[in-house]
């Protein structure tokens, strides 16, 4: 079995070869941790965003959208805490000259211990079969108990250090547990220090009159400072939400794993405003609702899990991540946070403007509490792409690479393929494509043999191929090929719109959420 890192490299190469993701500025040797989306990637990305947007704003009468500016008044970032607290604990290895997040190194060590425990459990389950009692095994096996004790002690020290913001203790943990640099294999570490992640620039026509501004590190603050505008003009009543999709920027020192961690990325965020005291009810609601949204895609329920935060952000009183099993392990794709009334209260304090809501049912005014759902578009893209990629053995030495995208997310919904480039078949193919293109992303592919064209469409995840042959000219029927099964059926060309609408419509996906 190929190593997971080799599988991931193959997936990344496929993304580039078939027009999904390119290294930005590639002809100038690229720019680290910055990527461009190609012709197929932008379609997949837009479909993911549309699925999220409609699940938020169409399925919820009390959620509306905005699009706030990237540049905002610099005092906003002072009020939000980003100027003082938006830092990562970084550590360098003197031998490899590489820089790492200290907390991630320790989290990876905890994950390694978890893997050892799980391997012991898996071996025992295989040995004992149906008679295996996992709970009893975990509670009594000496090796498992030894690993678990080490894991619990490490986890407790790590949690205490993070909550106390104790950088010296973070380094001591790395030394005590003999955590080595993954490249050099050495333990020659520097001290841990904090690094602010915001990009800073200037706005103004002259150097003397310029104002320091920041590229926003998150989209949430654009929602908070527009809370009053939306609430008043939309006559919104608590509880209600504001959704936004937009770019954010972080000067990630440790940017890695392709588009998983980038310096320029896109977020889909929704801030849900609730009564104080009801935040945990709504936190639980959105925690479950967001996981349901992910699982509706059919990528595999076992690939998802919750990860509750040990250390809470400065604004939160509850937080959990939805993690997805990437080729490089379970990683966060979405965060759900109870942000209390921190943000609105801070903006009320720093702006001097009253940011409160009068609740007619309670006959009182208050600063609303906020439940946030925040998902990285690029991470979502990567989770979909990785889970849908398959190098399939068809037998007799034949293989194909296929992307099993959910049909509603596929960049190209159907391809019309004339069997040969003569006898009026290309013209008929164009006629069919022209009818379908108003409702579906549809392309005509004439080059190469029909088999090669099928493989090409499989490689970009096209759910259906429509083959036009000589019989089409006689009775107006075409061959409809299904991507995942490769099965073919004969259908009337006039029925294609109806058939495709049932198979690839986003509505069919959204209805699973009701």
Task: Give, region by region, the residue ranges found by the protein language model.
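NTP/phosphate- and nucleic-acid-binding module
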Residues: 1-514
């Amino acid at each position: 079995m190929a190593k997971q890192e080799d599988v991931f490299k193959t997936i990344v190469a496929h993304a580039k070869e078939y027009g999904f993701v390119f290294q930005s500025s590639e002809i100038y040797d690229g720019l680290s941790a910055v990527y461009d989306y190609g012709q197929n990637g932008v379609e997949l990305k837009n479909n993911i965003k549309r699925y999220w947007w409609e699940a938020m704003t169409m399925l919820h009468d009390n959620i509306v959208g905005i699009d706030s500016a990237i540049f905002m008044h610099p005092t906003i970032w002072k009020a939000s805490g980003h100027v003082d607290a938006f830092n990562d604990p970084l550590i360098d290895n003197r031998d490899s000259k590489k820089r790492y997040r200290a907390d991630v190194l320790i989290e990876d060590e905890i994950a390694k211990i978890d893997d050892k425990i799980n391997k012991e459990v898996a071996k025992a389950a295989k040995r004992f079969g149906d008679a295996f009692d996992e709970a009893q095994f975990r509670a009594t096996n000496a090796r498992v108990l030894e690993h678990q004790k080490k894991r619990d002690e490490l986890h407790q020290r790590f949690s205490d250090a993070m909550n106390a913001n104790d950088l010296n203790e973070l380094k001591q943990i790395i030394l005590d547990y003999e955590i080595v640099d993954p490249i050099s294999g050495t333990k020659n570490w520097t001290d841990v220090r904090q690094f602010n992640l915001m990009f800073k620039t200037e706005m103004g026509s002259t150097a003397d009159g310029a104002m320091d501004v920041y590229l926003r590190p998150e989209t949430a603050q654009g929602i908070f400072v527009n809370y009053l505008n939306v609430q008043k003009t939309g006559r919104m009543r608590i509880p209600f939400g504001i959704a936004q999709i937009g770019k954010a920027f972080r000067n990630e020192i440790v940017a890695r794993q392709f588009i998983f961690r980038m310096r320029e990325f896109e977020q889909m965020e929704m801030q849900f405003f609730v009564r104080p005291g009801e935040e945990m009810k709504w936190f639980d609601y959105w925690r479950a609702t967001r996981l349901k949204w992910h699982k509706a895609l059919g990528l595999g329920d076992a690939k998802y899990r919750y990860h509750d935060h040990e250390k809470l952000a400065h604004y939160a009183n509850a937080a959990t991540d939805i993690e997805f099993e990437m080729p490089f392990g379970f990683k966060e794709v979405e965060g759900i946070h109870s942000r209390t009334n921190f943000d609105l209260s801070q903006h009320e304090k720093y702006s001097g403007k009253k940011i409160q809501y009068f609740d007619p049912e309670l006959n009182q005014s208050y600063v609303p509490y906020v439940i946030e759902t925040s998902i990285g578009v690029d991470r979502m893209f990567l989770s979909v792409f990785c889970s849908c990629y398959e190098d399939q053995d068809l037998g007799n030495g034949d293989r194909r690479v296929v992307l099993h995208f959910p049909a509603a997310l596929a960049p190209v919904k159907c391809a019309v393929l004339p069997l040969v480039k003569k006898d009026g078949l290309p013209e008929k193919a164009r006629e069919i494509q022209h009818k379908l293109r108003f409702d579906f992303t549809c392309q005509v592919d004439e080059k190469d043999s029909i088999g090669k064209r099928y493989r090409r469409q499989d490689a970009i995840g096209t759910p259906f191929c429509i083959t036009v042959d000589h019989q089409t000219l006689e009775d107006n029927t075409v061959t409809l090929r299904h991507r995942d099964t490769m099965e073919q059926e004969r259908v009337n060309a006039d029925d294609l719109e109806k058939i495709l609408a049932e198979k690839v419509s986003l509505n069919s996906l959204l209805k699973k959420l009701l």
